[in-house]
Amino acid sequence: MSATDRVNLMCANVLAAVAWPYANGPRHIGHVSGFGVPSDVFARYMRMSGHRVLMVSGSDCHGTAISVKADQEGVTAQECAEKYHRIIAADLQGLGLSYDLYTSTLTDNHAHVTQEIFTRLHENGYVVKRSEMGAFEPSTGRTLPDRYIEGTCPVCGYDDARGDQCDNCGRQLDPADLIGPRSKTTGAAPEFRETEHFFLDLPALAESLASWIDTRTDWRPNVLKFSHNLLEELRPRAITRDLDWGIRVPVEGWQDNPMKSIYVWFDAVIGYLSASIEWARRIGRPDAWREFWNDEDARSYYFMGKDNIVFHSVIWPGILLGTNGRGDKGGEPSEELGTLNLPTEIVSSEFLTMSGSKVSNSRGATIFVGDFLHEFGPDALRYFIAVAGPENQDTDFTWEEFVRRVNFELANEWGNLVNRSISMAFKNCHEIPAAGELTDADRELLDAAAAGFDTVGGLLAHARFKAAITEAMRIVGLANAYISAEEPWKLKDNPERRDTVLHVALQVVSDVNTMMTPFMPHSAQKIYEALGGEGVWAAQPELIETDGAPILMGDYATEQASWGRHEITVGTPLSKPSPIFRKLDAKLAQTGPQWAPVNPQ
């Protein structure tokens, strides 16, 4: 049984839960290298393999960061969140991320589901009230989220540890633990005051969490390392904050307090569930979400950057265990939600850096997605992230490497194979020619391409994107070498052999295009049409205006792309092809574009 067959037998329902980008500004390429492109490659492959996929996410619209940005722009927090949600949704549509639903945390549905989870945890005994020393910005008196406080880790000495965890050693922290704490907003030392909050009682869930994590042997090593480090010293974690911008706390005496709200990290992770419920209602099947959340045979994959591992590998599973009543204190699942599935796999990427620094809005090392798409289109970025992105280690983005990848791999190798194969077939036949008797060289190339579906598919099923696209490009290299060796342009006196070579080349182009579809769906559609295909090969998300806010959805059932060889049809008319990939000016490697120069002055 092939690797692809084994995956297809596992289950039919696959949840692709994609980290929620924060709506306090446009997203940069570092963001989409962590959550965006990897999740879409995976979701598209799973759909092509016959799975029923639900890919959900949305804009994270609550919390102090939104309030701070709103103050800077002289607008309300609601207006700020709505503005950037609209920008982010448009960018993600342009990138071709095939969400079944991309929404936001501003919906009534999301508030209701968040409060239902909070209430069930509270009733099951996993939410406790206690006092703590809260951090406040001295200049404004506004609460400082843990992630807005930096300092030196008391465990490993890392200088840029955050108030909730150290990204270097993975240790869970409180702001008061940091050595030399400072506000990321102003650089001032925070003011600590006693305040009362509700906490998620993670110690009461520790044993269940440890037992569950021990079963996650196929997770990426970086995720397992972080998760085990976090389990060593679990402590209660605050899930409310002194802030007027957020979801109200569903507890008597707190519900009407305008200065108490649910902590943004808590409501954000619940977004995967609330978005699934919203999706089901929007398609007219209000219980369809249960097929992905209550069905024990369903599988769920969570995509994020490494700075979000803590929330997805330990805290979100802890919330789910507590909601299900599976911690030390027992309890019952929510009657409304039922028993909820825990994550099958956490697919975490490392950081994309620029000149060794993390791509960051606050640090000035930024290439915004919208700018990139406007100049280079989506597939150049998608390809770069897949083949050279931070899948397993921090990766430095340089314009030199980007230009090299586009010009020498996309244009010279893959684009050249497509264009010369179709051009020669059009020039000589004006249609897909029939193959005569096959030689060993013909069969060898066709067999290599056919085998690629198992190899590439098996890698994609295990979220090994870089290895998968590298294997597809290896087949491109074999095909180019085959054409160079067979020299069909010299076979005018042997048209049967010429047509056979061209038929083999076109079949391999079709095969590789299928393998490339999850990575580069826009160019895959063009190549499909260049081969005479009609209709939708790779569907794209649609931006839909609803209730005054945009969402992304898509009718992916209309697409014809499926995983495996599609035999080309002899006699299909061909047209003279246009180049699929535009070569970039070599000077760009040294200068960068005007909006993101290599050496900004």
Swiss-Prot record:
Question: Which cellular component appears as one GO term in the record?
Answer: cytosol
One Pfam family in the UniProt entry: tRNA-synt_1g
Q: Where in the cell is it found?
A: Cytoplasm
Motif 'HIGH' region in this chain: 21-31
Q: Name one GO biological process term.
A: methionyl-tRNA aminoacylation
Q: Which UniProt keywords apply?
A: Aminoacyl-tRNA synthetase, ATP-binding, Cytoplasm, Ligase, Metal-binding, Nucleotide-binding, Protein biosynthesis, Zinc
One GO MF annotation is: ATP binding
The note on cofactor binding and number reads: Binds 1 zinc ion per subunit.
Record's keyword annotation contains Protein biosynthesis: yes
**Function recorded in the entry:** Is required not only for elongation of protein synthesis but also for the initiation of all mRNA translation through initiator tRNA(fMet) aminoacylation.
Name the chain's protein.
Methionine--tRNA ligase
Q: What is the lineage of its organism?
A: Bacteria, Bacillati, Actinomycetota, Actinomycetes, Propionibacteriales
Gene name on record? metG
